[in-house]
Amino acid sequence: MLSQKTKKKHNFLNHGLSLNLVIKPYLALEGSVAFPAENGVQDTESTLEKRETGDEENSAKFPIGRRDFDTLRCMLGRVYQRCWQV
């Protein structure tokens, strides 16, 4: 059997400080340190509400063709061809 000193010596987590003092969990951080963009999230939600309340009947509707989608995909970099080859 190992003595108490040997057990403590081989315990990697026992360095004189308790584990909860060494590592502070992410959710224990307070204020803007934990969630720096928290205010930005509220602004985004209000912007989305403003956009959704637009008048659907008066909005312009344009026909979108296959070539338009191909050009858009090219601009977003999701295809392996040059934009002028679309």
UniProtKB/Swiss-Prot annotation:
Residues 40-60 are annotated as: Disordered. Pfam families: Pro-MCH. Residues 31-49 are annotated as: NGE-like. Signal peptide: none annotated. One of its GO terms (molecular function) is melanin-concentrating hormone activity. InterPro entries: Prepro-melanin_conc_hormone. Residues 52-64 are annotated as: NEI-like. One of its GO terms (biological process) is negative regulation of synaptic transmission, dopaminergic. GO terms for cellular component: synapse. Expressed in testis but not in brain. Residues 68-86 are annotated as: Melanin-concentrating hormone-like. Belongs to the melanin-concentrating hormone family. This is Putative pro-MCH-like protein 2.
